[in-house]
C-alpha cells in the first residue's frame, strides 16, 4: 500500500512551500503592477499568478516526478556542460547578481530612504546601509543559529499580520475606484502579457528548480517513495500555499491600484509599498513595515548566501570552500546592491527573459518525460531551440545603449517578422514547440528509449 501524507504532514509541507517562495521582496512587484495596471488590473493579475504562483508549484512537482536530485541532475538530462552552465547561471541570478542585492535595496527603499532628507546623499546612505546589511547576513551565514529560527517562526507571522492589517485598511478605505484608474505603459494595451512577464521578477520559478528538491526530499523522508505519489503530494500540499500566495498577491495588487487615487505611480514597488503604509497607518506604520521587511529580507539573504555557497562548493570541489564562497557572494551582492533597487530590477530583466523560457521548457519536459522515456534527444532539441529564442529575448530586453550598440533594432525587426508572439516577449514559445516536435519525431522514429 502506497504511503500517503497525513493532514498534519500536508500542513507541514504546505508551510515549507510557502516559506520557500514567499519573501518580503516579492510584495514590491504586485503593488507596482497594481499601480501600473489600473482598470486592467484583473487581466494583469491573471498573468502574474501564472508565472508567480503556478510555475513555482509545477517546478517543485517536476523535481518530484522526474526523480531528480536537484537542478544539476535535472538539467543533466540535456548534457553535463549545459547542466553546469544553467545551474551556475540560475544560482548567480537568484543569488549575488540580483536576488540577494535586491534584499538589501528593498529594505533600504521601504525603510531608511523614506525618512532621509532628499539632498543627494542617498548613495552614501545606501552604501552604509548595505554594508551593515551584508555584514550581518555574512555573520549569520557563517554562524547559523537560533536567531534565524526565531526570525522565521516569529517574525514572518508578525510580518503577515501587519501586512494583513495594512491591506485590510487599504481595501476598506479605497482612495479610488478601480474602474477610474488609468492603465499605464504596456498594461494599457496588453495587461495579461505584461502581468505574465512581471511574474518573472519574483524569480520564484527559478527558485523552485533550485530549492524545490528540499521539499521533495522532505516528502520522501516522510515515507512517500512512489514518484507519482511524491509529485501528487507536492501538488496537493502546495494548493494551500499557492492559494495563500495568490490571495496575498491579489490583495496587495488591488491595494496598489486603489492607491492611485492619492499617489502617483512610483518608480518601483518598494517606494509604493512604503508610501501606502505611511498614507494609511502614518509614521508608526511605516516604521513597523520597514523593520519587519528589513529583518525578513535579512533572513532571505542569509538563506540565499548559504544555498549559493553550498552549491558552488559542491559544483567545484577543488575550488574555494564554503566559507570563501559565502564571503565572495556577500561582497558581490554588496557591489550590485549599490546600483539601487530600480537599477537592479531593470538590469535583471534581460537575464530573466533568457532564463525563464529555459526554465519553463525544462519544467515541461520533466513533467511530461514519462511519455518519451526522458529521452535525451527530446531534451536536447527542445532546449536547443529554446536557447536560440531565449538569446533573442535577452537582446530585446537589454538597456537601450547596449541594445543599439549591437544592432538591436535590426534584430528586433527580424524577430517580430518571423517569430510569433515576439512583440509580447514570448517569442520563445513557437521555437520551443518546434524543437520538441523534432525531438519527439526522432525519438519515435528510432524507437530510442534511452534514458537521459
Residues covered by each model-derived region:
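Hydrophobic, small-residue-rich membrane helices and short re-entrant helix-turn-helix hairpins
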Residues: 143-154, 192-195, 215-244, 262-274, ...
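Selective recognition of specific alpha-helical transmembrane segments in multi-pass small-molecule
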Residues: 54, 58, 158-171, 234-260, ...
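A generic transmembrane alpha-helix motif of multi-pass inner-membrane proteins
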Residues: 173, 184, 375-452
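Membrane-water interface regions at transmembrane-helix termini and the short interhelical loops
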Residues: 65-69, 73, 132-155, 221-224, ...
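TM-loop-TM module centered on a large, flexible mid-protein loop between adjacent transmembrane helices
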Residues: 70-76, 248-298, 305, 314, ...
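Membrane-interface loop-to-helix entry segments
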Residues: 141-170, 349-360, 379-389
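Hydrophobic alpha-helical segments and their helix-loop junctions in multi-pass secondary transporters
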Residues: 96, 100, 160-187, 205-206, ...
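Hydrophobic, membrane-embedded alpha-helices of multi-pass small-molecule transporters
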Residues: 11-22, 92, 169-176, 185-252, ...
Amino acid at each position: 500500500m502506497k504511503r500517503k501524507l497525513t493532514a498534519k504532514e500536508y500542513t507541514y509541507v504546505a508551510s515549507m512551500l510557502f516559506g520557500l517562495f514567499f519573501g518580503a521582496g516579492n510584495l514590491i512587484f504586485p503593488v507596482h503592477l497594481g499601480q501600473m495596471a489600473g482598470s486592467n488590473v484583473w487581466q494583469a493579475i491573471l498573468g502574474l499568478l501564472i508565472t508567480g504562483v503556478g510555475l513555482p508549484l509545477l517546478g517543485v512537482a517536476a523535481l518530484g516526478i522526474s526523480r531528480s536530485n536537484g537542478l544539476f541532475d535535472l538539467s543533466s538530462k540535456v548534457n553535463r556542460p549545459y547542466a553546469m552552465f544553467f545551474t551556475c547561471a540560475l544560482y548567480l541570478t537568484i543569488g549575488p547578481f540580483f536576488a540577494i542585492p535586491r534584499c538589501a535595496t528593498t529594505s533600504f527603499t521601504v525603510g531608511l530612504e523614506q525618512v532621509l532628507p532628499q539632498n543627494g546623499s542617498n548613495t552614501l546612505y545606501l552604501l552604509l546601509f548595505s554594508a551593515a546589511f551584508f555584514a550581518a547576513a555574512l555573520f549569520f551565514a557563517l554562524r547559523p543559529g537560533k536567531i534565524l529560527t526565531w526570525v522565521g517562526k516569529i517574525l514572518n507571522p508578525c510580518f503577515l499580520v501587519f501586512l494583513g492589517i495594512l491591506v485590510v485598511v487599504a481595501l476598506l478605505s479605497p482612495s479610488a475606484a478601480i474602474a477610474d484608474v488609468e492603465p499605464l505603459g504596456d498594461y494599457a494595451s496588453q495587461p495579461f502579457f505584461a502581468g505574465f512577464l512581471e511574474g518573472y521578477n519574483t524569480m520564484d520559478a527559478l527558485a523552485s528548480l533550485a530549492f524545490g528538491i528540499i521539499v521533495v526530499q522532505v516528502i520522501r523522508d516522510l515515507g512517500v517513495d512512489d514518484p507519482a505519489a511524491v509529485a501528487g503530494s507536492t501538488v496537493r500540499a502546495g494548493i494551500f500555499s499557492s492559494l495563500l500566495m495568490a490571495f496575498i498577491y491579489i490583495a496587495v495588487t488591488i491595494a496598489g491600484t486603489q492607491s492611485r487615487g492619492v499617489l502617483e505611480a512610483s518608480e518601483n514597488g518598494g517606494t509604493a509599498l512604503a508610501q501606502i503604509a505611511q498614507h494609511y497607518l502614518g509614521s508608526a506604520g511605516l516604521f513597523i513595515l520597514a523593520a519587519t521587511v528589513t529583518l525578513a529580507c535579512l533572513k532571505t539573504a542569509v538563506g540565499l548566501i548559504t544555498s549559493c555557497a553550498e552549491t558552488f562548493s559542491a559544483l567545484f570541489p577543488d575550488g574555494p570552500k564554503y566559507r570563501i564562497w559565502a564571503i565572495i557572494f556577500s561582497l558581490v551582492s554588496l557591489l550590485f546592491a549599490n546600483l539601487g533597487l530600480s537599477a537592479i530590477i531593470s538590469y535583471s530583466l534581460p537575464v530573466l527573459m533568457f532564463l525563464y523560457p529555459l526554465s519553463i521548457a525544462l519544467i515541461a519536459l520533466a513533467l511530461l518525460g514519462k511519455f518519451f522515456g526522458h529521452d535525451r534527444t527530446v531534451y536536447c532539441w527542445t532546449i536547443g531551440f529554446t536557447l536560440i529564442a531565449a538569446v533573442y529575448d535577452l537582446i530585446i530586453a537589454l538597456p537601450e545603449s547596449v541594445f543599439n550598440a549591437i544592432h538591436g533594432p535590426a534584430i528586433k525587426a527580424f524577430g517580430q517578422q518571423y517569430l510569433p508572439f515576439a512583440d509580447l516577449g514570448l517569442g520563445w514559445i513557437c521555437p520551443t514547440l518546434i524543437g520538441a516536435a523534432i525531438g519527439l519525431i526522432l525519438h519515435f522514429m528510432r524507437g530510442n528509449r534511452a534514458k537521459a
